Amino acid sequence: MNQTNAHATNRTVHDADSHITESGGWMEDYASEYVKSNLDKPFIDLENIPQLKPIFEQAKNRLAGNDPELTERLKSDLYGNPGKRNLMAAYGAVDGEERRDSLDIAGINSQIVFPGLVFFSRFANSKDPKVVYGGSEAMNRAMVDFCAADSRRLLSVGYLPLKDPALSLESAKQAIEMGVKSFWLRSDAVEGRAPSHVAYDPIWALLEEAGVPIVLHIGS
């Protein structure tokens, strides 16, 4: 049965919580040399866990175009193929064009696309503002690039650090110009300031004017 047959027609479906899976070196491709050399190591290096190595190697091989049969199996059975559970191996997990196609298959009109946990583990906790804001810029560019396959339907979520209100305002302006459609904020206090602190009011005014929402994950 065609996978889209189960979806009713004349209905708008919006996926409000999707993520990408970041492969090794994903962020480094967008970062300056300074940021690259000062990124923290991932708190979980998935690709070097012995049990997961075969999955990642298979995924890399497929994404390089060396296993079209596997790609077709994943695509033709988007919901049922066991490969969908295997992080990077899933169809559309790391490739924007595959993600766009997966929306068509699933009958989804649009999708908010979050990063994984790369920002928490690589730069957001750095004591160096250059790394925090440079890392944020790199990740935001990577997210916009992923969603460029169909930026009308794939809505990129960037990260907005709140370490320094003035730098955060410039970071928000830059990311909006890039094409970031929403910002993920940390819900806890940063430098003793909650997100509701008046020092951030110019940022909220900018986002309101641009029509760019913020999202929070309480407790993280």
Model-derived regions, located:
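Helix-coil boundary/capping segments in enzymes
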Residues: 1-220
